[in-house]
């Protein structure tokens, strides 16, 4: 009898214990799917901003300013960028020239032209017809940076390299985007071999919409970076950007194979820069 009572008591206690146990927590809901805008890739046919470089002399100050200095520019570059001494317009063409010249601790001079405050754009088509220099140690570029660094210093606020070329790899043109998720050697990019890259003019183009960024040479697409819809770490390209034209000397990439002084002066020639508004 006592044994049966004890078994019964244990049964009651077990039931009470089970009935009082909290239910296991529900699994967390799945993350929402990425939100990627569905938009057109249409652009106006007339430029909203352009420079045809049809007036000889200094570059148009209503369109361009200069970044000046010789601090390596975050890439251990060797040149000192001057205030228009290395950039002139002649015969319908802009000439940005890197040359051997001692300025401060730098042994080279060049120019770095920017449109900031004179041309800042959110989305659009950017078209530049240019001929780039070759030779070991040259590093010409056509690129865009965030006008306000809204998300923080590089690479958080983004960079779009419409054209980059390093002289030790003469026929190879690069298009790359950098952001907090992908930057430096891990930037999202593509390259295209152009046999006449340093001998002839080519049209370098970037199409930029809320859905993505595309890169072209002479009308042929060779790069695309789609907006992943995961936030500003991978898509800081929802703010105005400005354009940069420059010819660097040496640096982490441009100088990876050294600098050949026999190639200087080295000039990037620009026939025109045209910006077209994106049509939503």
Model-predicted segments: where are they?
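Compositionally biased amphipathic helical and low-complexity segments enriched in hydrophobic
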Residues: 10-14, 79
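GH16 jelly-roll
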Residues: 32-280
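Bacterial Sec-dependent N-terminal signal peptides
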Residues: 2, 13-44
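Sec-dependent signal peptide recognition
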Residues: 2-8
């Amino acid at each position: 009898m006592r044994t049966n009572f004890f078994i019964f008591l244990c049964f009651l206690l077990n039931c009470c214990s089970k009935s009082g146990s909290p239910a296991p927590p529900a699994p967390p809901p799945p993350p929402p799917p990425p939100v990627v805008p569905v938009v057109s890739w249409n652009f106006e046919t007339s430029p909203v901003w352009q420079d045809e470089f049809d007036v000889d002399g200094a570059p148009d100050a209503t369109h361009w300013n200069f970044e000046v200095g010789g601090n390596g520019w975050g890439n251990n570059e060797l040149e000192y960028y001057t205030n228009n001494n290395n950039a002139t317009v002649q015969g319908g063409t802009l000439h940005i020239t890197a040359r051997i010249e001692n300025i401060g601790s730098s042994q080279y001079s060049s120019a770095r032209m920017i449109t900031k405050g004179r041309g800042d754009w959110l989305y659009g088509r950017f078209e530049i017809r240019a001929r780039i220099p070759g030779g070991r140690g040259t590093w010409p570029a056509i690129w865009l940076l965030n006008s306000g660094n809204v998300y923080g210093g590089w690479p958080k606020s983004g960079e779009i390299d419409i054209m980059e070329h390093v002289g030790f790899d003469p026929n190879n043109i690069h298009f790359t985007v950098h952001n907090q998720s992908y930057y430096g050697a891990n930037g999202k990019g593509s390259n295209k071999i152009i046999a006449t890259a340093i001998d002839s003019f080519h049209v370098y183009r970037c199409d930029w919409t809320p859905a993505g960024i595309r890169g072209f040479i002479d009308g042929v697409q060779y790069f695309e970076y789609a907006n992943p819809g995961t936030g500003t770490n991978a898509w800081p390209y929802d703010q105005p950007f400005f354009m940069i034209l420059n010819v660097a000397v040496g640096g982490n990439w441009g100088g990876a194979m050294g600098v050949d002084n026999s190639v200087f002066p080295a000039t990037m020639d620009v026939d025109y820069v045209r910006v077209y508004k994106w049509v939503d």
